Amino acid sequence: MITLNTEEKIFIYSWLKNILSHELTEQQLQQYQQGVFTPLFDFLSEQDLAKQINTVRNSLMQLSNLPLAHLELAADFAQLFLLNGENSALPYASAYLSEKELNQHIAFIDHLLFKYQLKFDHNLREPSDHLAVYLELLITLEKSGQKEKSFNFIQHYLLAWLIPFNKKVQKIKTETSFYQAITEILITLLNKNVKLS
């Protein structure tokens, strides 16, 4: 059974946001392969996520046998998230919502960004319907201790499009299943969070 306190949720959501926002650098991948994240993986395995973590670990082992591992993983990231909507699972709400739903989402997201005075690195140039923006807002809501608002945000704003997003991610064939496992971890945690509310 998944049981996370607020600090653990914030840490894990931050980790997921960072890993799904951009490709891992060669140095970051080396940290994974050198066991820096072993305590986190062990913890998540104890939270009913052993299957997904095993896939992550197997993918890292697979990459360790390749001469340009970080480029292979970057290619997986690009294949999954950066091509067109036909060939990739774009990490934008606009790719999965109707125009009416999207307008409601954008209005609410922009309201929260203004309310919490959140600003993003302009070098990223991500619009407000990007997954990283949604996760940053969820982290902010968790930090503020507003559990009811967090649950509402997950149920009505995140899962509304992340479920079809994840289904598409799982169907795309890549060299490793690293990112497929990561998105599955995210969806599982969000679903459990809502069910425990």
UniProtKB/Swiss-Prot annotation:
Keywords associated with the record: Chaperone, Cytoplasm
Domain of life: Bacteria
One Pfam family linked to the record: Nitrate_red_del
Main location per the UniProt record: cytoplasm
GO biological process, one term: protein folding
Matching InterPro entries: Chaperone_TorD, DMSO/NO3_reduct_chaperone, HscB_C_sf, TorD-like_sf, TorD/DmsD_chaperones
One GO CC term, this protein: cytoplasm
Subcellular location(s) per record: Cytoplasm
Family classification: Belongs to the TorD/DmsD family. TorD subfamily.
Summary of the function given for this chain in its UniProt record: Involved in the biogenesis of TorA. Acts on TorA before the insertion of the molybdenum cofactor and, as a result, probably favors a conformation of the apoenzyme that is competent for acquiring the cofactor.
Protein name stated in the entry: Chaperone protein TorD
Upper lineage: Bacteria, Pseudomonadati, Pseudomonadota, Gammaproteobacteria, Pasteurellales
The gene coding this protein: torD
